[in-house]
Amino acid sequence: FSGAPEEFDAKSALLREHTIAVGTDFDAIVRSSNYNTVIGATEAEVADRIDAIEARVAPFLGKRTEGFMREYRSGTALCVGTPEQVVERLSDMKARGLGYAINYFPEAAYDRSGMDLFAREVIPALS
């Protein structure tokens, strides 16, 4: 499923239609989504982390760097932000029927502090 709320809703509605057509219980299906995740204690820290990711990938991606980084800088990425922002966005997705999120932390090989912050502040708030 797409991580964007509107796409998640549309795909959920389509899935519901299919389950009705084949006689399957829609509520028995766990819906998940993938999220690129960059989290920091402050918005300034998030911006610094995104800059660091860009600096790491730019030598390899060249002209494609801007496209690669677009989601991270878009302001619409649900799991890019402070713990409070991420909790708010994922809480909305949970209310829409998201069963679990699959989070990719692009900086994990270099810095685990974002993952630690997510584990410490986001997961308990959503449990």
Report the location of each language-model feature.
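Active-site-adjacent structural elements that line small-molecule/cofactor binding pockets in enzymes
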Residues: 1-127
